[in-house]
Amino acid sequence: MEYTGYLFAHFIGEAQLGEQVYFASSRDGLHWKDLNAGNPVLISDIGEKGVRDPFIIRDVLNGKYIIIATDLCIASGKGWWSAQYNGSTNIIVWESKDLVKMKLNNAFMHHILKIFMNFLMHFISGG
């Protein structure tokens, strides 16, 4: 597979739609262009209905792309105090073969180590 650029998954702030998944692309890693006309690419309606700190990995076993993020949503009125002391207990996981059609998996109580074991299987040892 030949790579022709970079894809950046991110959120843009604490506004109502700011805590969702946005994509930007770059050919050189320095100059970025918002995709989807600057609108969210993925919007969560489960858990706290927010998406923060998304990142993309590729499953080396099946070639699928996986986007993982927390469901923390400051815009919902929860506030930073609650976020710091109560945290967020959910991880949102999307899967895709092409990063165009995305499938949302159950967000509640994903065990993040299982996801990384598929991705970094040869680096993880022990139980």
What are these regions (language model features)?
Residues M1-G127:
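Carbohydrate-active catalytic/glycan-binding domains of CAZyme proteins
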